[in-house]
Amino acid sequence: LEVKDIFDGAVVTVGMGFFVGHVVHVLAYNPQQLTDDGIMAILRVWAGFSSTGGFIGAVIGSVLFYRVMRKREYWIHADTIMFGFPFAWVFGRLGCFTAHDHIGRLSDFWLAVQFPSGSRHDLGLYEALWTMGIAGLFYLWRNKPVKPGFFLALFSATYAPIRFVMDFLRNDDMSGADVRWLGLTPAQYGMVVLTLVGVILLTKTAGVESKEE
């Protein structure tokens, strides 16, 4: 692996993740912004972000880079980028917790946070704590001879189902509450797909990579 290939691929992957994350934020969560502001709602990429859209964008960006822009073996390069992701995601979600971007339902749970409207779940905190566990798994597997794609599979299979459940804790009684489509948030539909992808990939990447391969 060349450092330049990893670095450049990560830049394209992250950049596309931010762009598509914003597009999904507008189209899936706030379509009225498109009606009110037209194309500017899309171009203001700093004005809102969907993490699920970010995952979609990251896949698009990595495939575009390693399959089209600079053809390289896809899975080992994408997996190398993915290895660092949960460690960064912990800090991202701690930022969400600090800003209280994802206030949940009223609760007397011991980790609930006190707000003017009462004690509530804070999904940024919960997700940061869960992702710390995922990062710990990645660290434990860091020197094992895993097959390319294993870390992509591991993250998808461990993150997505828990995120699906956590979204049921999001508030629906405050202004700015997440939109629901047939009772589920847009992210929950994405997590169903990500879970399936993760499980399928795990069945293909589980086990130790053969030295002869």
Segments from the language model and where they lie:
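A feature for loop-to-transmembrane-helix boundaries and adjacent hydrophobic helices
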Residues: L1-E213
